[in-house]
Regions:
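Charged catalytic and DNA/RNA-contacting regions of genome-maintenance
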Residues: 1-4
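Catalytic domains of carbohydrate-active enzymes, especially glycoside hydrolases
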Residues: 43-59, 250-251
């Protein structure tokens, strides 16, 4: 079950939910350039909300392989206007900011974002976890290795479940003294792992469900899907739905996706099993 508090509200979901991806970048691997204007971003947000997404995840810094990382000022200029505009037009929407920078997270939270989705799990910015911990902000802690520039060079093998669990434990120790936290775990499927390791993480979520925290699975159009199927990222929506269904059957609490409608259908059907 997913439960968290934000902006003096408590949110409780008794079944898995969708986190819809809103990339306001010119260079994201799947949808770069589509929604980096305020009007197109707002329209896409409205579409995803109408399709049933529970959370909108706003990202302004692409971390695709072999891509130059946006500067802090570039990321800030991309995400803040979008957070402000969406919060104004959809005051009840749950907003997440996809960033590994504490400064961006803090700025977005002050403008009405609810969740920080950190692909580094606090690894890339030493100020992130203290900020999250002191303010008890809902926080997606993703497993990651290396740096923004090198993380895709890794291909972790072996006991991947234990590797991911150890990472969660170590990062959690850094904020545990600051009181109860609102952590959501993300195993980082597609980040520094072999295709076999990605499937292993997808098929046995309970092996790394640390402390009973909810688990987010973000596999939408990832390379382990389209490489296995021999298709392009844009052609991988059917494969994504199959993989998301596997995740749901294994206990996923949040699906982070580009195509909200297909994910909602997967949740609806699996809820009858």
């Amino acid at each position: 079950m997913l439960r968290f508090k934000s902006r003096n509200k408590e949110y409780v979901f008794d079944q898995p939910v969708v986190m819809g991806i809103l990339n306001v970048t010119p260079d994201s691997f799947s949808d770069g350039g589509k929604f980096n204007e305020i009007d197109t971003a707002l329209a896409h947000c409205e579409t995803m909300l109408n399709e049933g997404t529970a959370i909108i995840d706003i990202g302004g810094c692409s971390t695709r392989p072999n891509n130059a990382i946006a500067t802090e000022s570039e990321e800030l200029e991309r995400v803040i206007p979008v957070v402000k505009t969406i919060r104004k037009h959809f005051p009840e929407a749950i907003l997440s900011v996809d960033t590994f920078r504490k400064s961006i997270a803090e700025a977005c939270i002050s403008e009405g974002a609810d969740i920080v989705n950190d692909i580094s799990g606090g690894l890339f910015d030493d100020e992130m976890l203290p900020f999250i911990g002191k303010n008890h902000i809902p926080y997606v802690m993703m497993h990651c290795v290396g740096t923004p520039e090198t993380m895709h060079q890794y291909k972790l093998e072996g006991n991947i479940h234990q590797t991911v669990m150890d990472f969660f434990k170590n990062q959690h120790k850094k904020i545990e003294p600051l009181g109860d936290q609102q952590i959501i775990l993300d195993p980082g499927i597609g980040f520094g792992k072999t295709i076999e390791s990605n499937f292993a993480l997808l098929s046995n979520l309970e092996e790394y469900r640390f402390n009973g925290y909810p688990i987010l699975i973000g596999i939408s159009r990832k390379s382990f899907i389209f490489k296995t199927l021999g298709c392009t990222p844009q052609e991988a929506d059917n494969g994504t739905t199959v993989a998301n269904t596997i995740a749901l059957l294994n206990g996923a609490d949040i699906l982070r996706v580009h195509d909200v409608k297909k994910a909602i259908e997967a949740i609806t059907l699996t809820s009858h099993l």
